[in-house]
UniProtKB/Swiss-Prot annotation:
Gene Ontology BP, a term: L-homocysteine biosynthetic process
Binding site for substrate: T53, D124, E147, K177, D181
Name used for this protein in its record: Adenosylhomocysteinase
Cofactor binding note: Binds 1 NAD(+) per subunit.
One Pfam family from the record: AdoHcyase_NAD
Co-factor(s): NAD(+)
Length: 415
């Protein structure tokens, strides 16, 4: 079978979802028009491990319009939207994804998409890139892209160890990605996931945001806007100082764990909410992850110090600790915005996925010309994406005069 989804009968509903996303992704739809006419990806096979959402569907069908054959697997066992997966399968995309995959299912699906011998790898988190390298499956790969901070860190480590076998474009590093997707998109979708899972009031709560990168900045600002008192936990002195001057309290996790009501991780690192932190927490504390993998909260440790567990609501589990306190874990410690909600709004994914589509085209156009390194999105592409979005929104920006352009190039004239 050239696809494996939970229920193909959901395809009609999935198509409605995809069409709704298309309406809110005008920049990517503009690229699709060009791709459909020019077929820049004709004959190219793409293997993708991405969150299977309605927005991803718009990207995948844009690549298909450009002539590519795509095999898609989910990048998180709990983030796949089953109706969207069915809609894509019905439209000829090789989809191997469903919500609720086991770890075995997850890697089986990666193996399935690699049977198509892709020329381009698209990844969200770096698992696919790592898998093809560990299993010596890189010979036909022209290049790849990476969507996330976590994945870029892994790929940079591969580059430094000189084991990276093909060029990769770090879509995550584009201005039109991290300024909007990481900050604004994650900020809104994280709050959305927390509210869907808990239906609690944010105003008046003490919200602890662990990590103050672009994702943490976005989450902290949204909590603040909804009336929470926000505490930031950071290990970087620069980001800690920035958080302080943005108006947030800054302290260690040991201190924050004793006073927080809601804890959200956004670091991409291991056990930033540890067993010891959990034991310090208030009765009723809520834990959520918006980083990447389900390692930021020590879920194993939480289970070991619990005497009783029960599901209170969908995506909300109660753990009763030996000390009598109750701790509430959202989405099993996985990405709360994609498991308990639907991920980022289409409008911000429009920007990220324009970068993905144009980066794939760039890799194909420059086949054999790029080194086996991690590259940023070319600035011309980044700027093109911003201009496409502004045009779609009906926004005109100022153009410098010839005199102004000349002035900022010179060095002779000062005060």
């Amino acid at each position: 079978m050239d696809y494996r989804v939970k229920d193909l009968s959901l395809a009609e509903q999935g198509r409605k979802q995809i069409e709704w996303a298309e309406l809110h992704m005008p920049a990517l739809m503009e690229i699709r028009k060009r791709f459909n006419a020019e077929k820049p990806l004709d004959g190219i096979r793409i293997g993708a491990v991405l969150h299977v959402t309605k927005e991803t569907a718009v990207l995948v069908e844009t690549l298909k319009a450009g002539g590519a054959e795509i095999a898609l697997a989910g990048s998180n066992p709990l983030s796949t939207q089953d109706d969207v997966a069915a809609g894509l399968a019905k439209n000829g995309i090789h989809v191997y994804a469903w919500r609720g995959e086991t770890e075995k299912d997850y890697y089986d699906n990666i193996r399935e998409i690699l049977k198509y011998e892709p020329h381009v790898i698209m990844d969200d988190g770096g698992d696919l890139h790592a898998y093809v390298h560990e299993n010596n499956l890189t010979s036909k790969i022209v290049g790849g892209t990476e969507e996330t901070t976590t994945g870029v860190i892994r790929l940079k480590a591969m580059e430094e160890e000189k084991v990276l076998k093909y060029p990769v474009i770090a879509v995550n590093n584009a201005f039109t990605k991290y300024l909007f997707d990481n900050r604004i998109g994650t900020g809104q979708s994280t709050i959305d996931g927390i509210l869907r899972a808990t239906n609690i009031l944010i105003a008046g709560k003490v919200a602890v945001v662990i990590g103050y990168g672009w994702v943490g900045r976005g989450i902290a600002s949204r909590f603040k806007g909804m009336g929470a008192r926000v505490i930031v936990v950071e290990s970087s002195p620069f980001r800690a100082l920035e958080a302080l001057m943005d108006g947030f309290d800054v302290m260690t996790m040991n201190r924050a764990s004793e006073i927080g009501d809601i804890f959200v991780t956004a670091t991409g690192n291991l056990n930033v909410v540890s067993r010891d932190h959990i034991l310090r927490m208030k009765d009723g504390a809520v834990l959520a992850n918006s980083g990447h993998f389900n390692v930021e909260i020590d879920v194993k440790g939480l289970k070991e110090i619990s005497v009783e567990t029960r599901e209170v609501r969908q995506n909300l589990e109660e753990y009763k600790l030996r000390n009598g306190k109750r701790i509430y874990l959202l989405a099993d410690g996985r990405l709360v915005n994609l498991v308990a909600a639907e991920g980022h709004p289409s409008e911000v994914m429009d920007l990220s996925f324009c970068n993905q589509a144009l980066s794939v085209e760039h890799l194909i156009k420059n086949k054999g010309k790029l080194e086996n390194k991690v590259y940023n999105v070319p600035i011309e592409i980044d700027e093109q994406v911003a201009r496409l979005k502004l045009k779609a929104l009906g926004i005109e920006i100022e153009e410098l005069t010839i005199e102004q352009k000349e002035y900022i190039k010179q060095w002779k004239y000062g005060t």
